[in-house]
Regions:
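Non-catalytic beta/alpha edge segments that cap or flank active sites
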Residues: 1-161
Length: 161
């Protein structure tokens, strides 16, 4: 990745976990932060428990107050009752941008049959793109190369409104 490609862009990484994850223990969130930084994207980090209202509140705060162009979530996209990240994301976006989530599912499916179980969504709130990544560090590492090449164009498009 050429770090000059994304200079000036800012992202938030939001980890969703059943227990408030300590930053040093958050492999998936830290992987996303590292990928962003390697790509020259300034990154802020936050975590929240797997409560739909808490996730929605964090997404709104990050999109509306932190001047981030992207929010990358990790966790809460599976099939358990507590996996509510997609619902919280749908609660706050203005419109869907399904290609990101679809590409993540396709890439995940190439590595494991379980890749079809992720329910992640993606969409736009204001001028911020929100993408749900799976909670597995391995799935994050496999999915990032599918998403990253599109970010410059996505940012430019969002900037135009």
């Amino acid at each position: 990745m050429d770090p000059e490609i994304h200079v000036g862009m800012r992202a938030a990484v939001l980890t969703i976990s059943s227990s408030r994850t300590r930053r040093e223990d958050d492999e998936s969130g830290n992987a996303l932060v590292a990928f962003c930084e390697e790509a020259g994207i300034e990154t802020v980090y936050d975590s929240v428990t797997d409560d739909r209202a808490a996730i929605a509140t964090a997404l709104k705060r990050l999109a509306d107050n932190e001047q981030v162009r992207f929010i990358f979530t990790t966790g809460g996209t599976g099939l358990t009752r507590d996996d509510v990240t997609p619902e919280a994301t749908l609660d706050v976006i203005d419109r869907e941008a399904p290609g990101f989530a679809e590409a993540i599912r396709v890439e995940s499916r190439q590595h494991t049959p379980l890749g079809i179980l992720t329910r992640g969504v993606s969409g736009v709130r204001g001028r911020t793109l929100i993408v749900n990544f799976p909670g597995s560090p391995k799935a994050v590492r496999q999915s990032w190369p599918v998403v990253e090449p599109t970010l410059r164009h996505a940012a430019e498009t969002l900037e135009r409104g």
